Amino acid sequence: MPAKNKNKTRRSPKPQASRMRAPGYGFPEGTKGLLPWSWADQRLKKSHNYWITTIKAEASLTSPHAMVVWGLWQDGRFLFSTGSKSRKARNLAQNPNCVVCTEHAQEAVIVEGVAEIADVAARRKFLPVYEKKYKFDMGKMKDDILSMKEPVFAVRPLLAFALWEKHFQSKSTRWKFESPLSPS
């Protein structure tokens, strides 16, 4: 499994916005028209289903594996639970790099990040919000999640992209997140 996130780290409150780099797509120069981070943050919070892409853990297979998951955008990270024997969990144990996407492609938010095992405090915060959002009783799974028997992953963003179909050329935005700083 990826390393447990034992240290509290401080992060920049907002990532740095810039124009996407995609030659041939007609994106304008400069920063006029870039979307604010709040646009992406809102869509990450409101999405019901998310796509997560991991890299297959088997040595002979290096192709991506995409799957729909339920989760939360909470405290600047994407949190989701999965069985410890699921392909996602096995893949993330070997390679914590992943991509998370919101469900609506016409207002897409794509997050490239690193998955870490969420600590107990994050899990305690995650569970009631998750159950309310999905109207889903985690039942006995709560004990396994809180006792760390089953994983809850927290994807720490490194880069994020917004692609708004209606304003594709003028508003497509890229955000770069600061690396975590030393513990506070």
Residue ranges and their predicted role:
Residues 2-34, 107-184:
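Charged, gly/pro-rich active-site loop segments
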Residues 26-51:
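Short, basic/aromatic recognition patches
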Residues 36-39, 65-67, 85, 140-141:
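A generic local structural motif
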Residues 40-41, 89, 127, 142:
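Short amphipathic alpha-helical segments and helix-helix/interface helices
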Residues 44-45, 93-94, 131:
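Alpha-helix boundary recognition
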Residues 47-84, 90-92, 98-102, 110-114:
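Short beta-strand segments
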Residues 48-49, 97, 135, 160:
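Generic structural signal for secondary-structure transition and capping sites
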Residues 86-87, 121:
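A generic structural signal for alpha-helix starts
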